Amino acid sequence: MDDEPRITTHCIPMISKADIEAAYRNIQKDIVSTPLVYSQKLSHLCGCQVLLKLENFQMTGSFKDRGALNRLLSLSPEQRGKGVIAASAGNHAQAVAYHCQRLGIRSKIVMPMGTPLVKVVSTQGYGAEVILQGEMVDDAGELAIQLSKEEGLTFIHPFADPLIIAGQGTIGIEILKDELAKDLAAVLCPIGGGGLISGIATYLKETNPAVRVIGVEAYACPSMKASLLEGHPVRLGKTSSLADGIAIKMVGQINFEIAQKYVDEVVTVEENEIANAVLLLLEMEKIVAEGAGAVTLAALLNRKVALQSRKVLLVISGGNIDVNILGKIITRGLAMDGRIAQMTVRLKDFPGSLTAALEIIKGLQANILEVAHHRFESLAPFGYVDVSLTLETKGHAHIHEIQAALQGAGFLCEDQCRF
């Protein structure tokens, strides 16, 4: 945000392990100590021992509960009386709104125009006044800063605040005290503005420096990776990602400095890789993760890091995903796996042609989900008609087998899968 308070180590000291332990004492009774579980299926798939830290089990569905509560508990009676304001794509908004409601503090939240409806409605449900402004979190932040000055509200920064960072770092405490995390080699953590990874990295590196801390960003918005390459926070241009919770134009100064000191590596993942990771978590582990929450699995699955045969923990940072987006992800993921196929078959335009084609498909044990005639808009020559078929299939080899059988029977068949 162009007008955000510039938090640097010259005016505010770097946080320490002691700050994180103090934060844990403050918030422990009011946040969920989230499950840390071993995944046999994902371990087999990834070639290493995979642990999952499930922050989607927090009350508002993400790790943001921790930092938001720690920051709110620091407010003076006067600040509580006037209220707070925050800017967020959803998770920080919900966390601030929920804990403000619990603590009796008035809250106002500015969210980007494209924020998933589920996050907007949830934030309003916690009693916050929601204002939609701008295309990204940074844009919403400019209005939030302005309103904080005009109305005397305390601005609760989503990531560039030591108390927020210390709250997020309490995840590190829960990781290292869990017996499953003994001999842990690495922790993979999503990066947006950098609040989560800077907190976790501080605690882990000051407690057990041997544990590698690896950040994961969406390829579409690699703000931390770009900043580390340049040696200072870099502002990216307009962007969007399935991982909307980490689509941040610029990381915070304090977050950048902590990452420089403690983060071993930052990698990026593509949109299709994120979508596939969301689908695998849902299908294999029955875990609903948002795009930002699944980037860690996407990185491990696609061998972005060399951790074969090691014990690796993935922070699943949140599960607040729009149902419509989840539906699209499921469809796209099934198509990528060859479990849904869409093809166009050109038939002679007389009775029985479609039946003949469908009998071939039936014989190859594909399930027909949808049949659509294109009689009027078709470019087929006179005497022919194009029919689009959506099929449930058993993999890419099965799709090729169906296409070959149709072509062998004289049908022109074209793969039209565009999910």
List the predicted regions and their residue ranges.
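Short, basic, low-complexity termini and linkers enriched in Ser/Thr/Gly/Pro
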Residues: 1-11
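PLP-dependent amino-acid enzyme catalytic core
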Residues: 10-419
